[in-house]
Amino acid sequence: MAEQLQEMKKACEKVYVDSTVVDYLLDIVEATRKHNNIALGVSPRGALAYLKAAKCYTALNGGDFVTPETVKFLAPFVLGHRIILEDLYSSKKKAADYVQEITHFVTAPTEDFAK
């Protein structure tokens, strides 16, 4: 079991992330810090965890490079618990809903992302 985990970790580390995809990921993170309904956005450590999650998700699904679609898909799952809402108790939306909303407004890159 430990060997399998080490192999999985190595596979995650080998996944390529184009600089435009990293910028896109960081734009989403930054948007959580500027959103009117979010009191506390994603931290730098949260951004690193988001990047690692994208790389591991890609590796586990047989990919060699992270796509903007993967970054967008994972955002609510990875970032939803990393933000604090302005009006935590009266908001009808969940934190993950706000993150999902942000991904619709942040422009994704469209280049070729393979290494």
What are these regions (language model features)?
Residues 34-115:
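C-terminal engagement/docking regions of AAA+ P-loop ATPases
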Residues 1-50:
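Conserved AAA+ ATPase small/helical "lid" subdomain
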